[in-house]
Amino acid sequence: YNPGTVPQETGPNAEAMGLGSPVPGEREYPGDSEGEGSGPYAQRGAHRGDHMTHEADTTGAAAMQLLLPDAARNLLHFLGNSGRPLDMNTNGMLNDLPTLQGKVSEDLRTYTNEALKDAKASDYTGSVTYPFVTNWQPEKVEKSENSNWFYAVGGYHHATADTITVYPNGSYTYKYQAHTADRYNRDGGKKFGIGPIAVSDNELQELHRSGIAQEYNLVGESEVRTGP
């Protein structure tokens, strides 16, 4: 074979094996809109009150790990001040948030119908596979749906990546992954408490501004799921 190319083999049914044609992946997460978040990191020095708030919020986050596990994990990562990205636990979101699973299912229905329509119009004689990736779509968790994810992420984006295989008899199967992304930042307004300890967005914003806690990116993808 020619140097620099990927060899292709064929199986018993003459389908190509090896590396196929590239398809687009999910697009880069667009990030925050202007005005979100706490502004520049470490824009001022930390004073004693900041350190006292940091200590109290760390105690509060540790105390809420059983009731609000993902909210506590995300807050502790913020207070850890590394600024590194953190996995978003997309599988947990799909399991806990019917609205998210509903949006992903809607993506699947839309593109499955398109694949079935195209396959029928193409008069195919064998199975054919269609890949697709959606745009990032904005979502919002309501406290009434799940308080853990309300405090863990609030607003976020999702995208769905899928392959749909249509067979000659009109049946089909699909494999998909849900992708989620968010910027863990504080916009003000939220406040929650565990026992005597209350944690507010405004306090957390000041910790980022003073350089002893840091906003970061949340990114995640689900396991590959199959259907229907």
Regions inferred by a protein language model and the residue ranges of each:
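Low-complexity, glycine/serine/proline-rich disordered segments
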Residues: 1-106, 110-131, 135, 167-168, ...
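Negatively charged, low-complexity tracts enriched in Asp/Glu with abundant Ser/Thr
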Residues: 130-147
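Sparse, context-dependent recognition of short Cys/His-centered cofactor- or disulfide-binding micro-motifs
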Residues: 144, 201-203
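Mature extracytoplasmic/lumenal regions of exported proteins
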Residues: 149-201
